[in-house]
Amino acid sequence: MAAASGYTDLREKLKSMTSRDNYKAGSREAAAAAAAAVAAAAAAAAAAEPYPVSGTTKRKYQEDSDPERSDYEEHQLQKEEEARKVKSGIRQIRLFSQDECSKIEARIDEVVSRAEKGLYNEHTVDRAPLRNKYFFGEGYTYGAQLQKRGPGQERLYPPGDVDEIPEWVHQLVIQKLVEHRVIPEGFVNSAVINDYQPGGCIVSHVDPIHIFERPIVSVSFFSDSALCFGCKFQFKPIRVSEPVLSLPVRRGSVTVLSGYAADEITHCIRPQDIKERRAVIILRKTRLDAPRLETKSLSSSTLPPSYASDRLSGNTRDPALKPKRSHRKADPDAAHRPRILEMDKEENRRSVLLPTHRRRGSFSSENYWRKSYESSEDCPEAASSPTRKVKMRRH
């Protein structure tokens, strides 16, 4: 058997098996030593590098995202700094009690009633959907009333064009502000009452610096609301951006604006902040050098080009501003309905005058009206006969 297996002696076989086992053991020891060397090298590399090699991609991403994060943080810091500047120009006082508010609110209702009866001057009352303004002492042109849009174009009305400040405003509001040293004696010569219905608003604006002194004082009544700074308005549909600062305004509270809050940033009332009827009395002082409309001595520079030169002579009182709306007496709910624009009135008038079969023709009703009107000018008989129909040829 020993010869068949290739070994001549059992001792040789045992000797050969022992050498193989020793080789295997030596290989295992060498592998363990090599693994230990690799681990030691990896530990040394980890100690030399702040991040492992496998984290290089993550580190690069973090480095790339740092500028974006810093820009956002910079924007937030700027916004917080601007809000701090706004707050530095705001002073709020809870001055009027519930009973005092009720008395003043009853007086405001009297103002609304007198306006509905047409007892005020033409420029005292300014109506808009969901918001009415009542000017006392001094009034001024703004918004769509201006011939030229933009800051600095506002003008005071001539003296006497708006009613005097009611005596109750002096007794119930102004006098208390003077007693608490909010404003000095004799400071106020302009009082405006803004009456808002739910959903009403006033767009972002700065009270004209060339018209009014600072501070600007307002007192709130009927309900709580908020005064927002730095908003941007968009219309159709109406949308308002996030404010730099939203200032809660409580019923009976006094808000005083000056400095940055009055001059360097816009303020507004958002529609979502008027949930109930709200009124605010704004008390201001006009500047001595504030520009004023002069209706008796108008210059051609303040009139539209269509005005003839002979209209500048005499004692005509043509206003130096384009008409904003009709000043005829309206029913109590008229101010809270959508305005009917002049173009809508014209379209309605056409629909009444045009024949029924012409209202929905294959050509524009506007062209039909224009051609019909031109034909009536050429034919006096057609102009004098309202029932005469003008047949137009289609082209």
Curated annotation (Swiss-Prot):
Keywords: Acetylation, Coiled coil, Differentiation, Dioxygenase, Disulfide bond, Iron, Isopeptide bond, Metal-binding, Methylation, Nucleus, Oxidoreductase, Phosphoprotein, Spermatogenesis, Ubl conjugation. The gene is Alkbh5. Residues 60-83, 329-350 have a biased composition (Basic and acidic residues). The modification Omega-N-methylarginine is found at residue 360. 2-oxoglutarate binds at residues 194, 196, 205, 267, 278. This is RNA demethylase ALKBH5. Residues 296-306 have a biased composition (Low complexity). The modification Phosphoserine is found at residues 65, 70, 88, 326, 362, 372, 375, 385. Belongs to the alkB family. Dioxygenase that specifically demethylates N(6)-methyladenosine (m6A) RNA, the most prevalent internal modification of messenger RNA (mRNA) in higher eukaryotes. Demethylates RNA by oxidative demethylation, which requires molecular oxygen, alpha-ketoglutarate and iron. Demethylation of m6A mRNA affects mRNA processing, translation and export. Can also demethylate N(6)-methyladenosine in single-stranded DNA (in vitro). The active site is at residue 140. It comes from Rattus norvegicus. There is a cross-link at residue 329 (Glycyl lysine isopeptide (Lys-Gly) (interchain with G-Cter in SUMO2)). Its cofactor is Fe(2+). The lineage of its organism: Eukaryota, Metazoa, Chordata, Craniata, Vertebrata. GO terms for molecular function: 2-oxoglutarate-dependent dioxygenase activity; metal ion binding; molecular condensate scaffold activity; mRNA N6-methyladenosine dioxygenase activity; oxidative RNA demethylase activity. The keyword Membrane does not apply. The C-terminal disordered region undergoes liquid-liquid phase separation (LLPS) for the formation of paraspeckle membraneless compartment. It comes from the Eukaryota. GO terms for biological process: cell differentiation; gamma-delta T cell proliferation; membraneless organelle assembly; mRNA destabilization; mRNA processing; regulation of mRNA export from nucleus; regulation of mRNA processing; regulation of mRNA stability.
